[in-house]
């Protein structure tokens, strides 16, 4: 699963965010060299804020392409029909969705941002890949990142409050992550 995340982060052409940097730097150099030499980029479906995911299409051989999709958990789950669980591919049914939600909610309550990774093997073809190809994916797993607030955040918020300025939070993060961060910096998450 981490290799799939690395391929996605390595081969995307957009700006790499802190999560991509963490994935790239968290992979040992030997594995990174091996992945880069074995897999070639074929195409890319760029990130956009509507889909909240992005995909790269890579090939290890001339017969098959692999679409590697990475993004916000719910948006990835929406395009998955199966999940890799204990080394086997099983249907992504309600029971499995509840298990995933239980685990990821626990991670979010700890302030960890969760990014999901899914894949799909396709016969090799010519031409561009489209958003429609991001369907019937296999959820490979998810990676969790801690992105703590800067040490200066809480004092800055106190100073704003003392000056009579009300601070509102607008975030694309999970509600649970936002609540944890608000608690850490002394804001009411309500």
Model segments located where?
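The conserved cystathionine-beta-synthase
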Residues: 149-159
């Amino acid at each position: 699963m981490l290799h799939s995340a690395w391929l996605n982060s390595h081969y995307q052409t957009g700006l790499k965010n802190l999560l991509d940097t963490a994935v790239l730097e968290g992979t040992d150099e030997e594995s990174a060299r091996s992945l880069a030499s074995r897999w070639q980029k074929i195409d890319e479906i760029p990130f956009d804020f509507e889909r909240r995911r992005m995909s790269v299409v890579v090939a290890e051989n001339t017969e098959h392409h692999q679409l590697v999709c990475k993004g916000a958990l719910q948006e990835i789950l929406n395009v998955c029909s199966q999940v890799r669980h204990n080394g086997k591919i099983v249907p992504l049914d309600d029971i499995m969705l509840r298990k995933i939600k239980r685990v990821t909610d626990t991670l979010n309550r700890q302030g960890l941002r969760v990014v999901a990774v899914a894949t799909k093997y396709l016969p090799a073809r010519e031409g561009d890949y489209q958003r429609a190809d991001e369907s019937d994916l296999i959820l490979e797993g998810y990676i969790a990142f801690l992105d703590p607030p800067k040490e200066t955040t809480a004092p800055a918020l106190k100073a704003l409050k003392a000056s009579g300025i009300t601070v509102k939070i607008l975030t694309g993060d999970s509600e649970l992550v936002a609540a944890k961060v608000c608690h850490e910096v002394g804001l009411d998450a309500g």
